[in-house]
């Protein structure tokens, strides 16, 4: 579109690409904006041109003008210089802007390939609609004819003539070329205005002009001359009747153009292949410019742009070309001058050939034309066109001959020409492409003329020009041969017709050959000038075909080859062009002004759609293709070309239009190249024009769509045929048959529809034409019909492209190629038609327009000439397809696409044989009619076969309505339209589908609904049923596969290979993503399917076959089929299965995951089916039949049911766009132990997920055993919340989706919200419930499916209640998780008794605790603590060793030594197995400490803590003794087993005793679970156990010493000692915890020992914090679930600590001394003891807290750790144990190690500062940070700062802890470990160590109690804290005493151990000893004994002997206290109530 071109001029180069694609749209908009009037176009063009003129200076710079090589001041912008600025600006610029856009773009793009691509794009998407192009072509032909007639006619006449010529050329294959040629001509027209003025002044004077042009802008003038010649030639061709006029104008125009062309070609050939290469470059550039110079003004700038591009591309070539250009310019001057005298000289050839060349050169040009024409038309078409051309000119016969020869050659060379022609076409770019490839300056010259005819003759003209260049008119045959040689050189594939040119092409391709070819090119230019002058009208006519083929061929090959060749050529040409154009611009601008007036009339008419409203269809198309030329000529072309030329030469216009179409597409394809050539040719061309050229080129790029659009987008001067209103900036469509334009609104076409029509090669045919076409179908002669058909094909293609506009430029390229093929035929057709008369041309123009808009319609109803032409067009396209296949094998795939398009058109014609048996392509009307008939026939047949009582008239009406709706829906008869029609046809015809057609006929399914029905809805019931069966089968297979997969361990492929996935977090994340996507996919599938089925159902509602839905594939009466009703499960599931399975598998990382995903999909599908079935029952509710049916009874039941439960969580559930409400979570199944901590305050629902995906995932989780699954029920708090609750429920239920929580805490791997309707079945994966379950009559519920990490949970448990949590989680938790929640809740009341019983019977306690409700747990915290200790003792023996690795693998991953040395409690193992440390830990607590830890252990802990404050002594005495005995036994066995793997047997017996009170967490890996349980269960044997533990402790002390050396290397030795002091079972727990805590605090040690369990638990940091912080926290908030309880507990503990501060201070003093002694060991001991004490009892925790506080003052490190731990406990107690555990373990322990957690806790920091040796990184402070900071369990505690302060204080402790936990600072050998241990657990551990000496004295009991304390502490905060609340407080008292004693000892030991810890081996040994001592001390003495033993051990911990001696001492003290503890513990066991009361 002209305006678009103008806009393109303004488009910056950086936006050129966008402009290319937006060009068509811009054109539409621009056309709308400027189509109102030519003046608007002209003004806008002028304005834009003025912008261009500024662009000459600035805009061009902005638009890559710097790229332009021609800065020649003489080179004037066609727009602004000689050529009428209005003319140039209006039309030349407009067209050129489009062409220049491409040109500029190509200028920007150094590769000619890009330019070719751009050209292709432009060719494919011409600015104007095919009609407009054809009209403009016709107009251009007419105008060219007029110009030719007037010869020296004014610019307007010249423009008209040129425009016409160009239009015809564009109509032909060369219309695109012509656009290029015109663009070049326009570019050269400025010089060529001088040229053409001269040329117009003298026919032979054109030679002068040409010399001038060749000198100043040889290429631009050549292109303009060529354009002029082409225009004239086309006019003469089109005006074969008026060859004289044509000859004259064409001579004049052609002389100027040909003079340039001849100069170019002559230079090319004269320069030989060298110049041919260079000049062809220039010539193609020139032609490129000519394309650009469709806008004559911009053509120069286009040339310049091309020149710049080419210059940029081949600056060296440009130099050569500039030399050559100079040569050419001189040669052209001489040649032009000589042309008159010398045929050899291009000048003489040009001058004489104006008429002489008509005879002589006519033959060579005919030969060239024939060659190219044959290449394009292939023999017959080429001959015909060239014959016509020859007839048109004196050389028509020679042309025919040459065409025959060339056609033969071309047939042969066409294949080569596909590439060579592409080269030639590239050089000629249409005509310019030929010039480019053939070194076809001739072609550029010819392009102006050949734009009309050159597209067929261009190649010939180029060849002729080459021949002429060599021989001029005298050696026309030789020049033809030369042209062939040049072609062969230029386009090697072109062997025969273009061997010479092929030679030129290769030479062009070869930079070295540029000059040679260039000399040939000069010769050729001269010859071509002659030839072009004489036969160029003929040549133009023929060349369009050839050029088109060449362009087509060229584009595939030449775009690659010529991109380089043309780059060189273009550069050479740009140099030549610039030089020549600059020279000729001055000279030629005057002649050019005239010739350009003619040309502008011809070209602009074509170029400017606004200028060519009447001709717009044809002319516009040609002008779009000629865009560059016509734009300058456009103004005159517009008026004259429209009216006169269009009217006078409709046939010519038609041919021209087809040539233009052909030309334009090839030109557009080649334009960028040719423009480059043109630009290269005229290096002097000011780069200022590049913006225009670029815009033009860009427009060219979009020219096909644009030109098609413009054809049918509209001509600005056109008015709507219906409303008679101007464009009005509205989308207009041009009739494919006539020039009438119609508003899209008026004819019911939208731009998109028009584009679709263009894509489908459909034309819009107005009502008049439709009627006329039917009449005219058979009028045209076979030749005319062929020609018309070809033209119609091309027009149709172009129209299709126009319609496609921006839809698919590739398609337009394909069409362009196809059009090029057909245009080759069109050229002949156009020639023939021109021979036949102009009337046919007009008709053809109209037809072309119509065809372009309605090719389909043409097929059915072409105008008589039209239809004949269409019929032949089909034949010709077939032929041309064959030809194209041969000639375009080298051509781009687009050629094949074009061929396919032809075939499609033919097929369409065949389909619509009614109107035309072989119509080239059926029009949209024809297609629609065919569809109507087909539908009617189908319905009538079905109606006849059926017994329906429906009148046949209704069937016809229905068919018509269906087609109407179909068309209105798709807005076009495009592929979608046809596909839908086929679908409808198939389903309506389907004999099995007896419902659809009945519904359709009955009106049950309206046509509007019918066309929107999905294939499934349309399908028959049988088909639908089959699909469902297949889907179901697929689902079943998937489920089966998943079941198999579930049986297999879940593996994950990593860089290490396949590894079993213990943690499903990554998988689940993937699955969640998958599932989330999958649900979406399922939804999408389900929705369409459901909608389809529902639609079917709606249709079948009349019969309402919904109940029979499964019996039919599709029934419109079936609501399900119609989509009105949710499809049954079977229906949706199969479909879902396919999608979901695919999706799931896609997302899955491994087969298991994929299977799981698929299964999940399947499950989702099944679930969806299930829900669908429910929906069928109650369609409204998807998941739950009722939104939330809550009957009063149900509510009562719910309230009654919930009254028995304690909510475990309260917070917000928020789904941003759905609902937000406050809710409480009640346990349903699984262990709710740490949910309070694990669940965020606000659960953010991040999305939806398919239920099946969730259940598949859950199955995998269950199979993995590493996670624990917990189910909670959310209950709204208020009625308002109930509303939101119901909304959220309905949201998910209606979508059959689950909610996915987006903000899970660390321990919660995944959380899903499950909408469970009151009537919904409980998902099978959830049952049987392991917990309270759900009431029988329930309301609509939102369940929370929580998947937690067992191991991490266990680690958390390990940290705080490592033993307890691990034990329950280890053995029972797996089975318990659901039961734990429910049972724990239920058995909360039973807890005390059960705990006693539990101690009595390990199994019973475990089960009872599992059953105990959390509420009871809260009540039974004290008792729970004891049973938990027992449980811990009972459970630890088994997987403790297993867990170390697992636990280590978790958050605080201990070193291998830790793993090996640290036994993992069973809980840790179970946690690792269950996969959720925190969960397992919670479960363990809930199970083991169910009453204590579960439900609200915090409340119990608080109460217990308070009670213990008062009863702390008693509890500590009784419970702690018993608990400690148990703990000691456990800890002894645990520590022994942990430290001494060899003590597994011994520990087993001991562990068995302690198992009763201790969890398996305390169980050392070495100790068998049975032995450990035996320690737990055998309370009476606890002393013996303590003894055995002492033995074990000795072993463990060795191991602990080793481990402590490892752990204590940083700071684990003291934790180990603490563990040792407490007992190894509990000590292991506490050791693990201490290690965890220490690891968290002093990560290395913790990692070594506690870390494994912590790894098994939540994480070692978590474990540490739980063990240290968690102990106090768990004592305070046994379960971290109630954060308040924890806080209260902390408060209570603090109070207890304060109350017991004295004793705590004593203990802390002892422990401080001990801790200071064992700087790290004592911290870890304190931590262990503290954690154990806290775990054992909240009172002990309080004592520990007090001790810690006391220790802080007494200890520098220990006290600090203690106080810090206390602070941490206080804080963490607020936070869930998990948080505390993580914080304390990972944060506090590590913090203690790293100081950051320690120091965050001010007390600890102070104490740390006070006791730097142990507290630089005090463990207790670390523990407290965990408590204080309450880092979410899932969040690892922050890394501790380097041991700056603390470590400096403990110089003995190496800063980097021996065991560096991930994310945690390594423990320091000395102070680090002390500090980390001191921070939290260390104080506890010291307290326990203090107790440990007591326990050692009372070995089994004290140790067991300590162990129990440790274990409860380790087990779970709630359970352990409850459990510890009594025994732990007793231990605290003992620890206080012990700490007082041991604080000094620990200080001493810590000091000495700091040195030893500096030695990692010693620290490891200390760890091992501590473990043994912890277990020993815990067993021996609850607090003090263990602490004493720890203190004793901590000193020996450094030396194993000392540790062993201390262990013995601790065992003695533990035995002493152990006996007391046993008494106490037995009392606690016997008196669980008292323990509870104490708690």
UniProtKB/Swiss-Prot annotation:
<keyword id="KW-0832">Ubl conjugation</keyword>
<feature type="compositionally biased region" description="Basic and acidic residues">
    <location>
        <begin position="1912"/>
        <end position="2039"/>
    </location>
</feature>
<dbReference type="InterPro" id="IPR003618">
    <property type="entry name" value="TFIIS_cen_dom"/>
</dbReference>
<dbReference type="InterPro" id="IPR019787">
    <property type="entry name" value="Znf_PHD-finger"/>
</dbReference>
<feature type="compositionally biased region" description="Polar residues">
    <location>
        <begin position="144"/>
        <end position="168"/>
    </location>
</feature>
<feature type="compositionally biased region" description="Basic and acidic residues">
    <location>
        <begin position="867"/>
        <end position="878"/>
    </location>
</feature>
<feature type="domain" description="TFIIS central">
    <location>
        <begin position="927"/>
        <end position="1046"/>
    </location>
</feature>
<feature type="region of interest" description="Disordered">
    <location>
        <begin position="1643"/>
        <end position="1684"/>
    </location>
</feature>
<feature type="compositionally biased region" description="Polar residues">
    <location>
        <begin position="617"/>
        <end position="640"/>
    </location>
</feature>
<feature type="region of interest" description="Disordered">
    <location>
        <begin position="1078"/>
        <end position="1109"/>
    </location>
</feature>
<dbReference type="InterPro" id="IPR019786">
    <property type="entry name" value="Zinc_finger_PHD-type_CS"/>
</dbReference>
<feature type="region of interest" description="Disordered">
    <location>
        <begin position="1581"/>
        <end position="1623"/>
    </location>
</feature>
<feature type="zinc finger region" description="PHD-type">
    <location>
        <begin position="717"/>
        <end position="772"/>
    </location>
</feature>
<dbReference type="InterPro" id="IPR012921">
    <property type="entry name" value="SPOC_C"/>
</dbReference>
<feature type="modified residue" description="Phosphoserine">
    <location>
        <position position="1014"/>
    </location>
</feature>
<feature type="modified residue" description="Phosphoserine">
    <location>
        <position position="1925"/>
    </location>
</feature>
<dbReference type="InterPro" id="IPR001965">
    <property type="entry name" value="Znf_PHD"/>
</dbReference>
<feature type="modified residue" description="Phosphoserine">
    <location>
        <position position="1178"/>
    </location>
</feature>
<feature type="modified residue" description="Asymmetric dimethylarginine">
    <location>
        <position position="1867"/>
    </location>
</feature>
<dbReference type="GO" id="GO:0006351">
    <property type="term" value="P:DNA-templated transcription"/>
</dbReference>
<feature type="compositionally biased region" description="Basic and acidic residues">
    <location>
        <begin position="1581"/>
        <end position="1598"/>
    </location>
</feature>
<feature type="region of interest" description="Disordered">
    <location>
        <begin position="460"/>
        <end position="492"/>
    </location>
</feature>
<feature type="region of interest" description="Disordered">
    <location>
        <begin position="144"/>
        <end position="178"/>
    </location>
</feature>
<dbReference type="Pfam" id="PF07500">
    <property type="entry name" value="TFIIS_M"/>
</dbReference>
<feature type="compositionally biased region" description="Basic and acidic residues">
    <location>
        <begin position="596"/>
        <end position="612"/>
    </location>
</feature>
<keyword id="KW-0863">Zinc-finger</keyword>
<protein>
    <recommendedName>
        <fullName>PHD finger protein 3</fullName>
    </recommendedName>
</protein>
<dbReference type="GO" id="GO:0005634">
    <property type="term" value="C:nucleus"/>
</dbReference>
<dbReference type="GO" id="GO:0006357">
    <property type="term" value="P:regulation of transcription by RNA polymerase II"/>
</dbReference>
<feature type="modified residue" description="Phosphoserine">
    <location>
        <position position="125"/>
    </location>
</feature>
<feature type="compositionally biased region" description="Low complexity">
    <location>
        <begin position="1781"/>
        <end position="1797"/>
    </location>
</feature>
<feature type="region of interest" description="Disordered">
    <location>
        <begin position="1776"/>
        <end position="1800"/>
    </location>
</feature>
<keyword id="KW-0479">Metal-binding</keyword>
<dbReference type="Pfam" id="PF07744">
    <property type="entry name" value="SPOC"/>
</dbReference>
<feature type="modified residue" description="Phosphoserine">
    <location>
        <position position="680"/>
    </location>
</feature>
<feature type="region of interest" description="Disordered">
    <location>
        <begin position="528"/>
        <end position="555"/>
    </location>
</feature>
<feature type="modified residue" description="Phosphoserine">
    <location>
        <position position="97"/>
    </location>
</feature>
<dbReference type="GO" id="GO:0008270">
    <property type="term" value="F:zinc ion binding"/>
</dbReference>
<feature type="region of interest" description="Disordered">
    <location>
        <begin position="1360"/>
        <end position="1380"/>
    </location>
</feature>
<feature type="compositionally biased region" description="Basic and acidic residues">
    <location>
        <begin position="889"/>
        <end position="900"/>
    </location>
</feature>
<feature type="modified residue" description="Phosphoserine">
    <location>
        <position position="1898"/>
    </location>
</feature>
<feature type="compositionally biased region" description="Basic and acidic residues">
    <location>
        <begin position="642"/>
        <end position="670"/>
    </location>
</feature>
